[in-house]
Amino acid sequence: MDANGVDLTRLDGVFVRQQTQMADVGYLVFGVPYVTANKYQVFSLPPVAHEWVPTAQEVAGFEEIMFIHEESDTSDRVGWAFLGAASLRPLQYHFGSTSTGQMFTAVKSFKIGGWCGCPWEMDVLSGPPGDQILKGQVVQNFTPYCSRCFDAFCLATTFIDVVPASSFPGKDARFTVRTSLSCCGRVNNCCAPTCCRPKAIFDILDNSGKLVGVVQKHFVAGEGGEACCRMCLGVVNFSLKFPPQSSGEERALLLSAIMLNESYQPTA
């Protein structure tokens, strides 16, 4: 899938930067139960080492190739924020090319989580509104149940399956994104990404459990007070290194899987 303008198979990976929205700072300071619709810039990931830590100067020099915009109802953002559960709100992520516009859409419905038999999921669609084609799903993996409960509640680890439409109806995962926020995983991600530990590293596994790619979540140094503000608000920067043999469709699904996982991460 070339996503109508951006051939994802030609990229080693992408760097995604959530835009700082100062209105969120005001809502937080004054205790207003509201969150703004999130917006992200997507850049082509330059050839970088595994332990890359981006600087503000590097990020400023990146060329934007895509954007991601959240579409959600204002009433949902107010209502769920009032309940302290803004991450549960239904939404759509519109992925677009800076040159050609809309590329594909990821639709997230209301799901509490696999712990109660309601795993997170998003449908990934391409095509114009009213004539969209399902390209696949990204869904929280909660099987076996007891093991995944232990992973989630004791190890702060979640698993998101990437399921291309070609795998239906069996829904066999092509990749799994393993996100660990603790010190107990393959990489110690405790207190990351912050000024103390500038990156967290998450794993992309193939259907045999082999490590085939990584996602790095970054604290971008050199931005002064803005960097600290972004950290406290949970505003994200992450880089996604695509598995070498993945198709364009699979890469779009992997990017959607990261967005699904991010949409459920707690923020300030």
Each language-model region and where it sits:
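Low-complexity or membrane-interfacial segments used for flexible interactions
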Residues: 1-123, 127-268
